[in-house]
Amino acid sequence: MAAARASLGRIFPESSILFLCDMQEKLRDRVLYFPQIVSMAARMLKVARILDVPVLLTEHYPQGLGPTVPELGAQGVRTMSKTSFSMVPPLQQELDKLPQLKSVLLCGIETQVCILNTALDLLDRGLQVHVAVDACSSQSEMNRLVALARMQHSGVFLSTSEALTLQLIKDAAHPQFKEIQKILKEPVPEIGLLGFFQGMNNPLLPNSRP
């Protein structure tokens, strides 16, 4: 019965953490929908701060790819530089300090590289992984979509920033609901995934067939 509950992917502020992956200056003009996915990741960061969800951020080889873009609003967030294609090695010690951790909420770039490898490493640790698909992207749409399918088949929960936010607060009677509602009322940008999720041959859909 416990295993069945775990597979539902429920999330709680006290047992979750937000990972923000490699949203850096030199990738601004290379990654599809970069401004849009950064804006959605910024929303997740605002929500995490309101709900006291821990946040960790990485920068991939910042000497070459530059710093995190300022519009993410991540000033003051613990930041680690890395060369690995996973966030887990540089954040290992931070994860070990959180024995209550069960769920990782994952945003950033690129989907087929650091998001995918981070997700797999976290699954190996026995953690649930929730990828905010509206806060992840790649330089190639094919790489992005195949990586999302690959992650779901491996046990990652694909969700949206809004869905994850509402899962965290669970009730309109939540004391921070009004503050969070202001964030949710902001316009949601187009990020190019709607047609993919509607496709009859979409591998993410359980009843899809060739």
Swiss-Prot record:
Disulfide cysteine pairs (residue numbers): none
GO CC annotation: cytoplasm; nucleus
Main localization category: cytoplasm
Keywords tagged on the record: Cytoplasm, Nucleus, Phosphoprotein
PTM annotation (Phosphoserine): residues: S7
InterPro entries: Isochorismatase-like_dom, Isochorismatase-like_sf, Isochorismatase_domain
Places the protein is found: Cytoplasm; Nucleus
Any GO BP: protein destabilization
TM region(s), chain numbering: none
Family the UniProt entry places it in: Belongs to the isochorismatase family.
PANTHER family: HYDROLASE, ISOCHORISMATASE DOMAIN-CONTAINING PROTEIN 2B
Subunit structure: Interacts with CDKN2A.
Protein's UniProt name: Isochorismatase domain-containing protein 2
